[in-house]
């Protein structure tokens, strides 16, 4: 009787584990559907925007900023094109194609859509309440150096 009870309990636990695993794939989550809706909206917005020929220079946010006063430690300046030689090429459906020139507004919309969640939220650190407490005490994450 003890062996059959343990076997029955093991079988029930196995069934529970399998139902949790088959609960649903990640691509069917509500966040994924919201993301696909945003991508569709972005594509419709891109179709309505006029094509602009003026291109703004791309600034690398990870490149160090060198002070002109500190000339002893300054490195030779490199352009963005020299730092990333393949920046104008893009992998697209199995072949390398030249990336089309797009407007600055279109680039900003793409950056917003592709930005990680931590970059999109308005809070600087942990949340608005903790940021307010930190701002009052002068020790919070909202301070920028």
From Swiss-Prot:
One of its GO terms (molecular function) is hormone activity. Keywords: Cleavage on pair of basic residues, Disulfide bond, Hormone, Secreted, Signal, Vasoactive. The keyword Disulfide bond applies. GO terms for cellular component: cytoplasm; extracellular space. InterPro entries: Natr_peptide, Natr_peptide_CS, Natriuretic_peptide, Natriuretic_peptide_atrial. It comes from the Eukaryota. Disulfide bonds join 125-141. Residues 24-117 form a propeptide. One of its GO terms (biological process) is negative regulation of systemic arterial blood pressure. It is found in: Secreted. The record marks 117-118 as: Cleavage. Residues 1-23 form the signal peptide. Cleaved upon secretion to produce the functional hormone. Transmembrane segments: none annotated. Hormone playing a key role in cardiovascular homeostasis through regulation of natriuresis, diuresis, and vasodilation. Has a cGMP-stimulating activity. Belongs to the natriuretic peptide family. This is Natriuretic peptides A. The lineage of its organism: Eukaryota, Metazoa, Chordata, Craniata, Vertebrata.
């Amino acid at each position: 009787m003890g062996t059959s009870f343990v076997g029955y309990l093991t079988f029930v636990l196995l069934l529970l584990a399998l139902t949790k695993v088959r609960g649903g794939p990640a691509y069917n989550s509500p966040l994924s559907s919201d993301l696909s809706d945003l991508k569709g909206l972005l594509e419709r917005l891109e179709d309505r925007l006029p094509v602009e020929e003026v291109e703004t220079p791309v600034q690398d946010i990870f490149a160090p900023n060198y002070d002109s006063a500190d000339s002893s430690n300054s490195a030779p300046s490199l352009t963005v094109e020299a730092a990333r030689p393949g920046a104008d090429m893009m992998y697209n459906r199995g072949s390398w194609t030249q990336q089309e020139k797009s407007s600055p507004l279109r680039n900003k919309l793409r950056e917003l859509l592709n930005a990680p969640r931590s970059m999109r939220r308005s809070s600087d650190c942990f949340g608005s309440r903790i940021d307010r407490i930190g701002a009052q005490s002068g020790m919070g994450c909202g301070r920028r150096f």
